[in-house]
């Protein structure tokens, strides 16, 4: 459990303007709220708008606890939605309003929850070999499903089950509407978060391997579903790590951001004349959400008491930023909304 007290005065000092262009997205009478806590590693937030008299709600994965959590906007309660979910990680909503999920565990697959609650397996292998551990997922307007497949979920028992990778590379896949699965990106180490630009002419992918592979790559999307023109848009090498992210209507990238354990150290005297190598962070940007414009320039930062793994725009006006962060789910109203 993480104790959190929201700021009692406006504007909230947790919302930082790094560039004047970010000022228009900050609501000066809005502050960061903690909506729920008690998770072990929060991931994969996905929002479902109000429908048929049911209030809007957000689901997120609590991976080590092998469950999905639910925040109900009507009751403002944070509860267990479903257990035994094969260590679900990333989630998204398709164009028909159905939940699509990345599973770890022994299943290592992409599944869709139908309106009647039944499960449909969409992909679990590529070229006859099991996927690694699908991580993050998005749906394009042509109904194709794009997802990343790093090895994090098979590295140990904490977020699934330890297993040997059957794939030669860690890929980004495109699952076409007709069910054909293609590896569209095969040359980056442990792809993680991914998203499209508002016009769907760009695909952004986080490379989240060991240093120095902590960055967001930008690709041009080709009409046939392939990509070209790989460009490094954002470089996060240092003490910070990017995980999941979302793109807003203006093309800004709102990135889950957090301390990754990369420290500089210095020798310091302690009792008895001994030397202790104490850590000194390489960067002041630690836990929260860092916002970049479409050119890769940092423009804003939202400080959180925990590392943010992933985020989602939701609410009736799609201007509530939900942030899945380690043990807790946080939210902040902003003058922006997610690109669809």
Regions found by a protein language model. Give the residues of each.
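Loop/turn-rich, solvent-exposed surfaces of beta-rich toroidal or solenoidal domains
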Residues: 211-215, 219-221, 226-230, 234-297
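Beta-rich, blade/repeat-based domains predominating
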Residues: 31, 37-55, 84-103, 109, ...
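A short loop-to-beta-strand structural motif that recurs across blades of beta-propeller domains
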Residues: 67-69, 109-111, 171-173, 215-217, ...
């Amino acid at each position: 459990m993480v104790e959190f007290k929201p700021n009692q005065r406006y504007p909230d000092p947790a919302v930082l303007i790094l560039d004047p262009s970010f000022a228009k997205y900050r609501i000066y009478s809005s502050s960061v709220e903690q909506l729920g806590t008690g998770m072990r590693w929060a991931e994969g937030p996905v929002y479902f708008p109000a429908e048929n008299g049911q209030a809007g709600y957000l689901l997120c994965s609590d991976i080590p606890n092998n469950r999905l959590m639910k925040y109900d906007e009507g009751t403002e309660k944070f509860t267990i939605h479903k257990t035994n979910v094969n260590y679900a990680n990333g989630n998204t909503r398709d164009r028909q309003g159905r939940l699509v999920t990345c599973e770890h565990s022994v299943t290592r697959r992409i599944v869709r929850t139908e309106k009647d609650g039944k499960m449909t397996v969409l992909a679990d292998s590529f070229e006859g070999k099991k996927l690694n551990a699908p991580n993050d997922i998005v749906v394009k307007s042509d109904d194709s499903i794009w997802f990343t497949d790093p090895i994090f979920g098979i590295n140990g028992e904490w977020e699934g089950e330890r297993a040997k990778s059957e794939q030669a590379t860690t890929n980004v896949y495109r699952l076409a509407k007709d069910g054909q699965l293609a590896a569209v990106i095969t040359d980056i180490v442990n792809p993680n978060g991914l998203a499209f630009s508002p016009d769907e002419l760009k695909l952004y992918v986080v490379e989240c391997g060991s240093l120095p592979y902590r960055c967001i790559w930008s690709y041009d999307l080709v009409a046939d579903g392939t990509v070209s023109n790989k460009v490094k848009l954002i470089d996060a090498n240092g003490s910070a790590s990017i995980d999941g992210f979302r793109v807003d209507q203006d093309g800004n990238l709102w990135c889950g951001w957090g301390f990754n354990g990369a420290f500089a150290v210095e020798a310091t005297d302690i009792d008895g004349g001994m030397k202790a190598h104490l850590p000194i962070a390489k960067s002041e940007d630690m836990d929260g959400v860092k916002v970049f414009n479409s050119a890769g320039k940092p423009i804003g930062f939202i400080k959180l008491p925990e590392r943010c793994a992933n985020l989602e725009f939701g609410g009736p006006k799609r201007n509530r930023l939900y942030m899945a962060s380690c043990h807790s789910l946080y939210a902040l109203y902003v003058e922006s909304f997610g690109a669809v």
